[in-house]
């Protein structure tokens, strides 16, 4: 999947995502670098307008898998990035919703 395909799929659901508390959603990793393959997962970085629990994060991940039409999403909260990886992830992250 390309960044453009991902943006197109998410565009129709921006309002729903905002109602669910999603402030921003960015892709990073192979999809952001345009070197993904059929086996690649989709790495998404999410930021919420409120504190959420782990079960809610899984609920959002499941909904995104439905919207995008894949079952290979890694969803991580922006505030939970490991310090050793944070700079690299943020430098390649591309906002998609």
List each model region and its residues.
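Catalytic core of pol beta-like nucleotidyltransferases
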Residues: 1-24, 32-38, 50-97
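Conserved histidines in hydrophobic membrane contexts and catalytic metal-binding motifs
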Residues: 27
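Structural signature of the urease/amidohydrolase superfamily beta/alpha-barrel
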Residues: 41-43
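Short hydrophobic/aromatic beta-strand micro-patches
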Residues: 45-49
């Amino acid at each position: 999947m390309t960044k453009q395909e991902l943006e197109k799929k998410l565009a129709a659901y921006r309002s729903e995502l905002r109602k669910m508390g999603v402030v921003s959603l960015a892709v990073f990793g192979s999809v952001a670098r345009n070197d993904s393959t059929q086996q690649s997962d989709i790495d998404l970085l999410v930021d919420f307008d409120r504190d959420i629990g782990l079960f809610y994060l899984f609920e959002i991940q499941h909904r995104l898998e439905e919207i995008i039409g894949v079952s290979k999403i890694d969803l991580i909260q922006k505030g939970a990035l490991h310090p050793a990886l944070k700079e690299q992830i943020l430098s390649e992250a591309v906002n998609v919703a």
